[in-house]
Amino acid sequence: MASYPIVEIFHSVQGEAFHTGVPHVFIRFGNCNLRCEWCDTDFLTYEEMDLNDIVEQVLAYDCKRVIFTGGEPAMQDLQSIGTELKNHGIHLSIETNGTIPIPDIIDWICVSPKDQLYPNVSIKQTTGDELKVVYCGQDLSMYDDLKI
């Protein structure tokens, strides 16, 4: 059985971007391949949870939308957890830094790149549904090829 580093699972309305105001269950994963100083997640403090426990907790909220966030959620086995949640009719969204390709099972991809802060890091995700910029002075022209 797969286990995942979970910082928290909670129900709230999405407060940012396209889905603002829409109820979601947030699954915040631990671990990240970047270390942004402004990050609001203590991604090094988490509890290992198995897939069945995560799904059970999500289903208890009776909400048909989940957003994977972190840390960097693309570091996890999203195919397994995504398949299990999809079997329950749940729409899957992700907020990612874009450095790891996202599996096709994800319905909505928000790319929030930080690669300009990390010269040795490049964007691997080539498609998305929205681009989220979180720091001033970011040169957005480098994302012109991102298919959004």
Q: Language-model segments: which ranges?
A:
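Conserved Radical SAM active-site core
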Residues: Y4-E8, P23-H24, F29, R35-I106
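Short secondary-structure boundary/capping segments within folded domains
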Residues: G15-H19, N31
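A generic structural micro-feature
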Residues: H19-G21, Q125
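Short, solvent-exposed loop/turn segments at secondary-structure junctions
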Residues: C32-N33, Q116
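Conserved AdoMet/S-adenosylmethionine-binding subsite of the radical SAM
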Residues: A74-I148
